[in-house]
Amino acid sequence: MVAINDSTDSSFFKENPKIFKDEHELLRYIVPFKNWVIGRPDRKEYAIRNGAPKLLLNLFSLENLSMNEKYQVFVVLNSLMSEDQDPFVQFLRHEDLLSVMQMISKRDSTPYGMLNITLKVFNTMLSFDKAAEYVTQLHSDSIINQMFDLYTLPLKEQPSLDVLRISNLSSKILHRLILYNSKVGDSPRFCSALFQITNRATQLRLYSRRRFWNDCSILITNSLGTLNAYLKQHVKSYKQREKTRLESNGHVSPRDMDLDEIENVFEGNKDKVALFKSEIFGPNGDEYITQLFCLVRQFDPCIRLLSISCLVTLYKAGILSKNQTKEIQMIVTPILIRLFFESREAKQIAPRILAIIINENEIMQKTAVNAGFIDAAKYLLEYATKEEENEINFLSDELQSSVCFNLPATKKEQKNLILESVLLAVAALTTSKDEYRKLIVDAKYLPVIINALKINSNSVKKAACECLLSLSRSVYILRTGLADADVSEPLIKLLSDPDTRVKSTATSAICNLVLKFSPLREKFLTTNFIDTLISNISTKDSSLRKKTVWVLRHVVFGDDETIQLEPLKKIGASKLVELCNDEDLGVQEQMLQVLRNFTCQKEESVDFLLKMVPMELLAKILLEKLESKNPILIEPSIYILVHIAASDGELRDSILRQTKLLLLVKEIMLQEAQRLKPEQMSTNVSSPESDSEMDLQEDDFDREMRPPFDIYEEDTYEPNSEILLAGIWLCINILWPKQCTSPSQEDKERASILQNLGFGECLQMLQNHSSPDVRERVKDALMYINVTD
């Protein structure tokens, strides 16, 4: 319990000993109690701990309260809720919410002062999840209509501070309700009102100058924030409908696609865009978008940021026209970079919005670099990491009174958010081009990024890992800028982080750093590192499992036999089989790739694997993968057989005994040959020595590890020549002659078996294939299979 030290405090409670025991007694002294707690956090805490929340909420049920008594109760309630909301959550009842809504519904007979404080309390109550769900589920239409009516007061009445503040509070409540239910009746009418209020508030700011300036600014930011939430909810709803359509048409299974994977929901379809615009904006969609671009040029940083947020939501959904997209590039992007030097709110938000725009978009990335991103971001990093004495915690009135951005209040949290936002922007800039990665390294960003891995903030650590992931996708940077970087120790430590998302992002960053040609590989390959990976394999999080197995895929590809064998020894046979049959398709694929890399070029590794998993069991596993008809499982499965066949004659014969497996390989080869288009052909030379996964991590691996704002492309499993090449290499390795001079009897017998299975005819069909790789390998295979002629 908080101690009350001054004499005034103690005398107040000595005179009123029952004030925290009976709601009637509290009501009797409500005015002196109000004066006692307001402006005093210590007294608020004392009152909360002594049961004031329950008593105040109980007062709602008293029907004979006067308007003044209700007002005083609401003022005290609002003051205590602003101090600590948690104690109110357990005592808040449905009837309390109904009492507040009833008060709001009688607005014609309720003074504006009373209405104002009622809306404040209601807005705070709606920040409780259960309260918001109850209101939106059972009273959605009525309360939304009431809030809409109050929100549009500035269009109906003469401007006053009360009118503006009621409109502001109503917009906050609408914002919260939209997050739970995006259906707001007549959508075009709602959006029209948002823009009308924004225009009205803009005019009032201009003509009334200081009188309404602050309240009008808050109203504009709240209106834009509500609009952005509304647009996001409708885009999400459209994605859900699109996903349902794809599932019903059999194009995708429910488990194969997240909503975030549908990047451009309109697929460049002008009719779909026009229909969506009409649903949301009515006939004035382009006019409203033009208004948003006008607001981008406003002097106020908060208004700029929120109008840009609305435009970026439309841009990422693919709703903007080519000319409007050009304005995002030429106007919005440079303005965002200039906002790096503006208010502290702008410093926290602008880099994150910029990251959304430039992520995986080389045109936008080039514009950002030309607009001075490198220097501006470096300035922000220095600002965020600089220790300053006596720095005051500060948020502008617009954002303190807004629900649009959930910004932290403390100096440390604000600087961490700035650091996180800048790191996400750096990660987004460096997703594609080595040129920009080199600029980042040359500008000395790496020490800041590495230090961010050690900061006590999950979001900052995750963002730093994102940067390392983007930078490490370049072979040049991997061998130069990152070569001497001290990243192994902090990254290995993050593999044991309590936060799963941090572990997952750190794992994805490590993936490229342990490639065979990486200078950092040896620093990672320690017993502790391997043990941590093996531990993470058993996690319930499928994304982390997949990424952990992907790292092992690179770890086992190397010349050091001890390092290569250790992971599989620690995994064990039963876990290995379990991972091959994991419920997550990505984990299955990566475990097969582990076995593919493990068996590459080494007879000892093949022998070790077959001691763990006998040939009959392995063949059964591979048969199931081939029967799945899924290319991401088929290719590594066949290459495992390719590597086993490259070992010795006995193993080739054991493969030849798997008739069902070989027939399925032949069938797949024929299907791939018929489906493959010329533009899908590989131009890379493949061989048993080079077929293992030695590429840098591709985009489909780190989809979930990109910045959370990103929307990713749907995975498409198109046929590719690698599957054909794998099948041809299997024939070559099975038929590889025992001696160079003339084919032995064993060679002829193996060739005869493959001929009888139909591989000869299959290879004949591939002689004129469009892919030069396929044609070259087919020549070799035919030379060996025709020894029986």
Curated annotation (Swiss-Prot):
GO cellular component: cytosol; GID complex; nucleus
Swiss-Prot/TrEMBL ARM repeat ranges: 434-473, 476-515, 518-557, 562-600, 603-646
Annotated Gene3D superfamilies: Leucine-rich Repeat Variant
GO biological process terms on file: negative regulation of gluconeogenesis; proteasome-mediated ubiquitin-dependent protein catabolic process
Keyword Cytoplasm: yes
Pfam families xrefs: Arm
Keywords for this protein: Cytoplasm, Nucleus, Repeat
Protein's cellular compartments: Cytoplasm; Nucleus
Keyword Repeat: yes
Assembly and oligomerization: Identified in the GID/CTLH complex. In the absence of stress, the complex exists as an inactive anticipatory complex (GID(Ant)), composed of Gid1, the E3 ubiquitin-ligase Gid2, Gid5, Gid8, and the RING-like subunit Gid9, awaiting a substrate receptor to form the active E3 ligase complex. When cells are shifted to glucose-containing medium, the substrate receptor Gid4 is induced and becomes part of the complex, named GID(SR4). Additionally, Gid7 transforms the GID(SR4) E3 ligase core into a higher-order supramolecular assembly (Chelator-GID(SR4)).
Role according to the record: Component of the GID E3 ligase complex recruiting N termini and catalyzing ubiquitination of proteins targeted for degradation. GID E3 is regulated through assembly with interchangeable N-degron-binding substrate receptors induced by distinct environmental perturbations. Required for the adaptation to the presence of glucose in the growth medium; mediates in association with the substrate receptor VID24/GID4 the degradation of enzymes involved in gluconeogenesis when cells are shifted to glucose-containing medium.
Family designation: Belongs to the VID28/GID5 family.
Protein name (record): GID complex subunit 5
Species annotation: Schizosaccharomyces pombe (strain 972 / ATCC 24843)
Gene name, Swiss-Prot/TrEMBL: gid5
